[in-house]
């Protein structure tokens, strides 16, 4: 193999370099090449073929003997001999078995052949019968080379029967399983190759290496060079093992140098020579002596610096170095960088740039030398106690970017057989799955083709349906009308839905208002019931009061009739009104002029009670006495009495009768006592002093109206007229002038109490005044 072949394929050169090593697994494809059968096909003997055809330049243009050149037909397929291919032939041609002659001239012959991409596309699809792959590659060769390379013509029968088989186009089809491409198992690499002829070893090596390279998924086409850095204090740096099966920047390190005794001796000898030279030339040139001194000092500094720069390291790890930084500082700085990259979520596909990482790390790492050293040499390292590995590389713009990856990813790459140091398993990938790009491309292509066929079938069916619909115009019109009706129904349905929503909202509002109204009605009902209860109680009280007044009226009329005759002989009438424990007496004088008579009767709390005449029999009325109530006039304990009353002017003596009214108050009750002919109304019992006369006022809205005390006929028969009883029937309130009455303890109580004026001579009551009966009741 010459230099041109190595330049044509970088991967081929790398493979040849690996073949020089004693590993036998590189020769795994050598035994597949059979040169004897190829020579027998051509019908020529191997020895005669080599003796008659001398090696020439691939593009030689010397004169040719036309009788020795075979005739080639344009459009015919020929089988090629790979051993005779020139070095500058296309690299893809080394894996092709047959080619097609497209053009023939006296000097050149042009052949066409399919590329590997065209073969993949052809075999991954479903080719039609009688078709072949696309011949997208072309190669022009001389007539002499064509005579050596094109060994035989492919027959028509063979072409028709095997054109759709991969063995027809490829020399080793098992390496190109286009249906399910997989790599050759690694265990086959350990099989020793069978012995091959010495003459064909080089060609087979190139052929096998080429096929192996073509079979790769694309990760091995690049060229990587190992850079070895040798410092000024090192003559040669030993080769170190790469990290995770690939070279990184951290693979090149300064290692510990053995004791540099020879360098020290050499420097000492140089120093001695310089000192001797300085001593010999000291007298001749002083400047040269100074210069030599400077050189000597510089050499000493260099030797000391070389001693200091010896680094003690293990496995190329700078964390164990003791030159400038301790292992603790290394660990702390690496931890800071790891935390920063974790906080920024630096991962593959979303790295962090060097400038950003350095600016952030400067806040935690003060030594810029240590920081720059770590940024340069931390790639491929796994910090202590972490499960992530530092990675870095240059992006397309040339900027350095850093990220973190799982520490076990390197072992996964090694087990998967991927040589790309930046390969990341795709989502859903499992150990044992194919990692080649070709497998994924073929699978995607098949799926796309299947989907395309399904879509085409659907399109055909739609076209057929459209054709049928075009013939039936009535159905189309019906369909359009039904579609319009459906759209109208949809619009009407939408309107109805809106109306239903509005009605629903209104119903909810009405229900809410109904609930509020129910609450208000219940509240009003409770108030009404309360008012009705009050009204019932008031009506009962008014009814009771009316019955009391009626009974009082009847008794009063009867009493007045009975006392009408005796009252004429009585000169005056005495009235005792008791309020509390005091009693005030007033003497009412009767006269002919009744208009001059003034009297009033006021009933205050507590309520009054009438006494029978027998209870007032012990009372005596003294004539001409003062208005005070003496103790001798008291009928019983607690009731003051007055024996004499001052005569009132304007009243005749004949009208003053022995009528006595006593009002006694005990606790909350007030008892009013009239003459002997006055009886107690049925509502007020005379035997029980604690009985009360409820003087409840009628309601303003009560249907009960005040009634007349006397009937007209009865009043006329008795000598009373309605005009005389007008004040009594209406119960008109009148104020009494108390200035003319005498003052005293009993008199003040009489004036403050209730007053009643009786006219015995006239046989009636001139006026009756009371606050309870006269005041118009009102309720809140």
Curated annotation (Swiss-Prot):
Major place of residence: nucleus
GO terms (BP aspect): cell division; chromosome segregation; meiotic cell cycle; meiotic sister chromatid cohesion; reciprocal meiotic recombination
Leader sequence residues: none
The entry's keywords: Cell cycle, Cell division, Chromosome, Chromosome partition, Coiled coil, Meiosis, Nucleus
Highest taxon in the source lineage: Eukaryota
UniProt cross-references to InterPro entries, sorted A to Z: DYAD/AMEIOTIC1
GO cellular component, one term: nucleus
Chain segments carrying region Disordered: 32-60, 237-327
Basic and acidic residues bias spans: 263-291, 309-327
Function as written in the Swiss-Prot or TrEMBL entry: Plays a fundamental role in building the proper chromosome structure at the beginning of meiosis in male meiocytes. Required for the transition from leptotene to zygotene in meiocytes. Required for homologous chromosome pairing, and initiation and progression of meiotic recombination. Regulates meiocyte cytoskeleton organization.
Protein name as catalogued: Protein AMEIOTIC 1
Species annotation: Zea mays (Maize)
């Amino acid at each position: 193999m010459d230099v041109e072949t190595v330049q044509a394929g970088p991967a081929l050169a790398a493979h040849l370099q690996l073949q020089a090593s004693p590993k036998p697994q590189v020769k795994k494809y050598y035994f597949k090449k059979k040169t004897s059968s190829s020579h027998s096909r051509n019908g020529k003997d191997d020895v005669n073929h080599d003796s008659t055809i001398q090696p020439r330049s691939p593009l030689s243009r010397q004169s040719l003997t036309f009788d020795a050149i075979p005739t080639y037909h344009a459009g015919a397929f020929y089988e090629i001999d790979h051993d005779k291919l020139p070095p500058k032939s296309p690299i893809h041609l080394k894996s092709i078995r047959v080619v097609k002659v497209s053009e023939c001239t006296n000097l050149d012959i042009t052949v066409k052949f399919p590329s590997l991409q065209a073969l993949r596309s052809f075999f991954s699809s479903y080719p039609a019968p009688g078709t072949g792959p696309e011949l997208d590659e072309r190669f022009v060769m001389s007539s002499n080379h064509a005579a050596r390379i094109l060994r035989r013509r492919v027959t028509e029968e063979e072409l028709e029967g095997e054109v759709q088989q991969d063995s027809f186009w490829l020399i080793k089809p098992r390496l190109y399983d286009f249906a399910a491409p997989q790599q050759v198992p690694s265990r086959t690499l350990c099989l020793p190759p069978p012995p091959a002829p010495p003459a064909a070893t080089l060609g087979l090596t190139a052929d096998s290496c080429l096929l192996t390279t073509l079979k790769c998924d694309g990760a091995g086409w690049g060229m990587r060079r190992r850079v070895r850095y040798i410092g000024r204090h090192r003559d040669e740096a030993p080769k170190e093992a790469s990290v995770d099966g690939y070279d990184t920047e951290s693979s090149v390190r300064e290692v510990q140098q053995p004791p540099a005794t020879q360098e020290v001796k050499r420097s000492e000898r140089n120093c001695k020579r310089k000192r001797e030279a300085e001593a010999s030339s000291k007298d001749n040139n002083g400047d040269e002596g100074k210069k030599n001194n400077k050189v000597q000092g510089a050499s000493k500094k260099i030797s000391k610096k070389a001693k200091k720069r010896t680094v003690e390291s293990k496995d190329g790890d700078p964390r164990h170095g003791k030159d400038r930084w301790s292992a603790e500082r290394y660990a702390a700085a690496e931890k800071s960088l790891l935390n920063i990259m974790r906080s920024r979520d630096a991962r593959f596909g979303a790295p962090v740039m060097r400038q950003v990482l350095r600016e952030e790390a400067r806040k935690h790492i003060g030594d810029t030398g240590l920081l720059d050293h770590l940024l340069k040499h931390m790639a491929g390292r796994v910090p202590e106690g972490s499960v992530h590995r530092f990675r870095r590389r240059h992006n397309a713009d040339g900027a350095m970017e850093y990220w973190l990856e799982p520490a076990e990813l390197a072992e996964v790459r090694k087990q998967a057989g991927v040589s790309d140091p930046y390969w990341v398993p795709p989502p859903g990938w499992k150990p044992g799955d194919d990692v080649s790009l070709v497998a994924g491309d073929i699978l995607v292509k098949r799926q796309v083709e299947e989907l395309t066929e399904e879509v085409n079938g659907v399109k055909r069916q739609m076209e057929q349906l459209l054709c049928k619909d075009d013939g039936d115009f009535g159905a189309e019109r019906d369909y359009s009308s039904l579609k319009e009706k459906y759209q109208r129904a949809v619009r009407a349905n939408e309107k109805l839905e809106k109306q239903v929503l509005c009605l629903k909202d209104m119903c909810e509002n009405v229900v809410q208002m109904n609930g509020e109204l129910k609450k208000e009605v219940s509240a009003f009902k409770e108030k009404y019931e309360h008012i009705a209860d009050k009204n019932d109680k008031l009506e009962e009280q008014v009814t009771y009061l009316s019955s009391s007044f009626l009974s009082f009226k009847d008794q009063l009329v009867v009493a007045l009739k009975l006392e009408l005759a005796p009252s004429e002989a009585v000169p005056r009438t005495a009235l005792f009104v008791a309020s509390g424990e005091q009693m005030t007496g007033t003497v009412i004088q009767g006269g002919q002029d009744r208009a001059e008579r003034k009297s009033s009767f006021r009933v205050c709390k507590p309520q009054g009670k009438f006494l029978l005449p027998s209870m007032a029999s012990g009372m005596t009325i003294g004539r001409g006495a003062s208005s005070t109530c003496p103790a001798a006039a008291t009928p019983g304990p607690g009731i003051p009495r007055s024996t004499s009353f001052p005569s009132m002017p304007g009243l005749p003596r004949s009208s003053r009768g022995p009528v006595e009214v006593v009002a006694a108050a005990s606790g909350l009750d007030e008892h009013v006592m009239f003459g002997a002919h006055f009886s107690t109304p049925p509502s007020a019992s005379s035997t029980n002093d604690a009985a009360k006369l409820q003087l409840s006022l009628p309601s303003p809205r009560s249907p009960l109206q005040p009634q007349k005390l006397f009937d007209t006929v009865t009043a006329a028969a008795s000598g009373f007229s309605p005009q005389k009883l007008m004040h009594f029937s209406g119960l008109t309130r009148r104020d009494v002038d108390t200035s003319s009455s005498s003052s005293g303890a009993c008199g003040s109580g009489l004036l403050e109490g209730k007053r009643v004026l009786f006219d015995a001579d006239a046989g009636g009551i001139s006026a009756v005044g009371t606050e309870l009966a006269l005041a118009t009741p009102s309720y809140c």
